[in-house]
Curated annotation (Swiss-Prot):
GO terms for biological process: ceramide biosynthetic process; sphingolipid catabolic process; sphingomyelin metabolic process. It is a multi-pass membrane protein. The lineage of its organism: Eukaryota, Metazoa, Ecdysozoa, Arthropoda, Hexapoda. This is Putative neutral sphingomyelinase. The keyword Oxidoreductase does not apply. The gene is nSMase. The chain crosses the membrane at residues 362-384, 391-413. Its EC number is 3.1.4.12. It catalyses: a sphingomyelin + H2O = phosphocholine + an N-acylsphing-4-enine + H(+). The keyword Membrane applies.
Length: 442
């Protein structure tokens, strides 16, 4: 029996005030597209300006009358949800690690990033929509935020598990800054047992060649672009969720203009929910995929869903299934205990490396503070030449300020980040230790 049908859309709108190009005309164009009535639930990221949030809500209220913006940090979390159906409850969970406050040019810390939950009532069924925007990757060769994203991914998976309750469907839609081969993607998908609505190499959502905002360097680095914007799905008990369609629905350019809607591509998934009769001897919650790929062919995949354990017999039978690559299939088809264990072990190794680096950083900051303190004492004892007193006084204030910064980074900030990483590491160890023995509960 068909319970409901939903069109879910996610888009990073690139709405950074004074930085993002063509921001106002792009927001207007996005409003017009969302007001077309094609989408039932919309998950937006990087809505950093209050005026943009209000414009998006007001411009779409005729077809998406229910909305919620998640406030957090200095600038707001940048997360906005628009819905055709009533939003009965909301909850925001801030991540324990989220970049560095002194990296002003990156600004992730100021957003107070986390995962936002909207409990939406659709046709008598409770749907949980999770909106998230993981920490950005600024340097692929030297990614100092990799551990932060891994912990954010694991934290998000645990948040989804802890809050899913008796919801018929859980949807995570957002900019996860993680490609399918990345460890943060694997940790999130394998530990949450969600399904990626896309598994086709033909889709890219960022740094795309046709996007007007893709730089020449990005095109040279990734000629085809990357896929970091995702819609993950997980069915509730006694529910079969069919992913009927996956596509990038927006045109390449804003109509009548030479620029794109955003530096990211919008992603849409069409979902159908069916009620299943529970069976005591078989798993009951499933995810079924039956959707079109780019060349027009179809594929069908059934995935064990939210509340089900994978027994050894299930695992063995799955090994005889042919590998299917299609628009709606997912690497989470392989999210068996072995794959989850491998992902967690890799994540734990990253956490250990980060903890060692934090210890080294603490020593370096204290050493720098000690050296600068000696320099400050010498400056105090030194008599400034005539005409140089103002400069010397300013120099003393600068040195004193740097000393305070080094002491803060070596003590308060170092312990804050250490505890954040340590908490994530301990939580992963708990799952790794108990998951295989108590697989039913994971």
């Amino acid at each position: 029996m068909l319970l409901l049908e939903l069109n879910i859309l996610t888009l990073n709108i690139w709405g950074i005030p004074y930085v993002s190009s063509d921001r106002r005309p792009r927001i207007d164009a996005i409003c017009k597209e969302l007001a077309s009535g094609k989408y039932d639930i919309v998950s937006l990221q990087e809505v950093w300006a209050q005026e943009d949030s209000e414009l998006l809500q007001k411009g779409t209220e005729a077809v998406l009358p229910h909305s919620h913006y998640f406030h957090s940090g200095v600038m707001g979390a940048g997360l906005l949800v628009l819905s055709k159906y009533p939003i009965l409850g909301t909850l925001f969970h801030a991540w324990s690690v989220n970049g560095y406050f002194h990296r002003i040019q990156h600004a992730d810390w100021f957003g107070g990033k986390g995962v936002g939950l909207c409990r939406i009532l659709v046709g008598g069924q409770m749907v949980h929509l999770y909106n998230a925007h993981l920490h950005a990757e600024y340097d692929n060769a030297n990614d100092e935020y990799k551990t932060h994203r891994v912990i954010q991914a694991f934290d998000t998976a645990q948040f989804i598990e802890a809050t899913r309750g008796n919801s018929a469907l859980q949807i995570l839609a957002g900019d996860l800054n993680a490609q399918p081969q990345d460890i943060s993607y694997k940790v999130l998908l394998y530990t949450s047992k969600m399904l990626d609505s896309c598994d086709s190499d033909s889709f890219r959502t960022n740094e795309c060649e046709h996007n007007s905002y893709t730089s020449k360097q990005a095109r040279e680095r990734n000629p085809l672009g990357i896929r970091i914007d995702h819609i993950f799905v997980r069915g509730g008990d006694h529910v079969n969720a069919e992913i009927a369609e996956y596509k990038l629905p927006f045109p390449e350019r804003v109509p009548g203009e030479k620029f794109s809607f955003s530096d990211h591509e919008a992603v849409m998934a069409k979902l159908k929910l069916f009620k299943l009769e529970p069976r005591s001897e078989e798993p009951v919650a499933t995810i079924e995929v039956n959707c079109l790929v780019e060349d027009g062919e179809t594929c069908s995949v059934r995935e064990v869903g939210a509340g089900d354990a994978l027994t050894g017999e299930d695992d063995q039978s799955s090994q005889h299934q042919p590998e299917i690559q299609c628009n709606g299939s997912s690497t989470s088809i392989q999210s068996m205990p072995a794959a989850r264990t491998a992902a967690l072990l890799e994540a734990l190794a990253l956490c250990d490396a980060s903890l060692l680096q934090l210890n080294t950083d603490r020593i370096l900051y204290y050493s720098a503070a000690t050296f600068l303190f000696v320099l400050l004492v010498l400056l105090v004892e030194f008599t400034a030449p005539v005409g140089m007193r103002t400069i010397f006084l300013l120099l003393k204030f600068i040195v004193f300020g740097v000393i305070l910064f080094c002491v803060f980074m070596a003590s308060i900030w170092n312990y804050m980040e250490r505890n954040g990483v340590l908490q994530g590491k301990k939580s992963m160890e708990v799952m790794l230790h108990h998951a295989q023995k108590y697989e039913y509960f994971y």
